[in-house]
Regions:
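Mid/C-terminal beta-alpha module of Rossmann-like enzyme folds, strongest
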Residues: 2, 202-266, 281, 292-296, ...
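N-terminal Rossmann NAD(P)H-binding glycine-rich loop of SDR-like oxidoreductase domains
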Residues: 2-22
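SDR active-site strand-loop-helix element
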Residues: 5, 30, 67-68, 101-104, ...
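NAD(P)H-binding glycine-rich loop region in Rossmannoid oxidoreductase-like domains
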Residues: 35-95
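Conserved Rossmann-fold NAD(P)-dependent oxidoreductase catalytic core, especially the SDR/UDP-sugar
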Residues: 86-131
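Conserved beta-loop-beta element that borders a ligand/cofactor-binding pocket
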Residues: 104, 136-161
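Glycine-rich "substrate-gating" loop/helix at the edge of Rossmann-like oxidoreductase active sites
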Residues: 155-165, 185-197, 221-223
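A conserved pocket-lining segment of Rossmann-fold NAD(P)-dependent short-chain dehydrogenase/reductase
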Residues: 173-194, 206, 213
Length: 310
């Protein structure tokens, strides 16, 4: 049995499909209101803030994947991430199962230094601190050999379906709704977004490869990084038309944050949009040289087709 904790997000859904396709037919989907991605999926409604719920959710599980998402609220992240991680660690210990933790880069400092698996977790923003607390708990449990676990870390998402992320929301969703695409701060700095189907495929591969445990892995991204200007130029090329986009400066975003809670919550992350954001996944590519990473050009094509953007 392989169990996905937080199965209704885009990562959890794609992970469930990948696991069933290539690794395991016994799959349990856990969430507050889980929904099947395949008729044979097992469903288990649980609140991961409740230790007994979490223990029951992992009964008879061999590998657990923690892909849960929390509301985009700094106070909730700072309060709840460490509780969830403590509960999941204890539940894995009780049920003697492995853990694959899907993490993001919020705990990294927002500078232009290349991000690797050894980059310190040193961000001082509330969301970053919440994620640091969770990761630190797991790293300590791994070091103390309390649990057999692995951390899979990913940068900002872009992808088809219900993928959430700045690039999807500000570029592709706006194009889909015949609105002007927007980018934050600068269009001439390099980005390293990850294609969500690649993230899920890579996490399934890591989870089912025994020698990957006890480590942190950066999930694979295209190394041919694009600026937002280049990204939108590629969209123009594929659509065969000009796209006029708008760059939102800090003052505009700050003013907007007084009227938009999601934008207010995003202010913590703004520094990374003013610099080259280089997320290095060479460790994964060295270990798994046959894994096919989706190019940005192909990822854009898939999203444009999925969103029916003409």
């Amino acid at each position: 049995m392989q169990t996905i904790l937080g199965a209704n997000g885009i990562i959890g859904e794609e992970l469930a499909r990948e696991l069933r396709k290539n690794y395991c037919s016994d799959i349990r989907l856990v969430g507050r209101n889980p929904k099947k991605t395949h008729p044979d999926d097992q469903l288990f409604a649980a609140d991961l803030l409740d230790i007994q719920n979490t223990i029951e959710a992992l009964k008879n599980t061999e590998i657990a994947y923690l892909t849960v998402g929390l509301p985009y609220d700094s106070e909730i992240w700072l309060r709840d991430w460490q509780i969830i991680m403590k509960n999941v660690i204890e539940a894995c210990k009780f049920n003697q199962c492995k853990l694959v933790y899907f993490d993001n880069t919020y705990a990294y400092l927002q500078n232009s230094i290349i991000q690797t698996e050894t980059t310190p977790l040193a961000c001082q923003g509330k969301k970053g601190r919440g994620k640091k607390l969770a990761a630190t708990l797991l790293l300590k449990a791994i070091a103390n050999k309390e649990i057999d676990a692995v951390i899979c870390r990913a940068p900002e998402f872009y992808g088809p379906g219900k993928t959430k992320g700045l690039t999807n929301g500000m570029v592709f969703e706006n194009l889909k709704n015949n609105k002007q695409p927007k980018v934050f701060l600068k269009d001439n700095v390099k980005r390293t977004p990850i294609f969500t189907p690649d993230a899920s495929r890579a996490m399934a591969l890591i989870g089912n490869t025994p020698d990957t445990y006890g480590q942190t892995w950066h999930l694979p991204c295209d190394d041919n990084r694009l600026t937002y200007n280049q990204f939108i130029t590629e969209i123009e090329k594929q659509l065969g038309r000009t796209i006029n986009f708008k760059i939102l400066n800090y003052f505009t975003l700050k003013v907007g944050s007084f009227f938009n809670k999601n934008l207010k919550e995003t202010l913590e992350l703004l520094p990374r949009y003013a610099i080259d954001n280089i997320f290095d996944s060479s460790k994964f590519k060295t270990r798994f040289p046959n894994f096919k990473v989706t190019s940005y050009q192909e990822g854009i094509r898939i999203i444009l087709n999925d969103f029916h953007i003409k």
